[in-house]
């Protein structure tokens, strides 16, 4: 299930911004890295000079604009594939509430995935590979209600989206995004604290206590 696709131009500007910040070419990118757990997807960029950048949707300008629905292409707001009857063999999307869908299943913060089989071929493929996975039957409509709102619903455009793209070339990308979607000192403090408590080994423990 697709959340949306930002314009390639914005992505290219973001990559240049990161390369300039780290004075290095990029070796690898993970858009939703799980270093801090499944519920804390993070942008991770590994550079050829050995440095690594981590930034969650709280502080990373690209992720923040993506999840605030301001950076997607116009076609994303009128997506023709937003329905349950699809031409694919499978529909796959994040399962954030596995413990509410399957009795006795614990949320280990490593991640579960919702899977809807859409075709006969999909059934045949699943039959061949099911021994390699832990599979739990769930109610499709309940799973969609909990985690799959975008199975049927397209992204809603941010009210300032047109202005956002019209002015994109005037500023460096992080400054530009900051104008429309501010990243606060509180955001940076929370992000900094998260990295510290992760390094001392208590991050997941605290997340469980607060959930």
Question: Where are the language model's segments positioned?
Answer:
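Long, compositionally biased charged/polar accessory segments in the mid-to-C-terminal portions
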Residues: 24-211
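Short acidic, glycine/serine/threonine-rich loops at helix termini
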Residues: 9-14, 41-45
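Long, charge-dense
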Residues: 1-12, 29-32
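A structural-propensity feature for long, helix-poor, extended segments
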Residues: 18-19
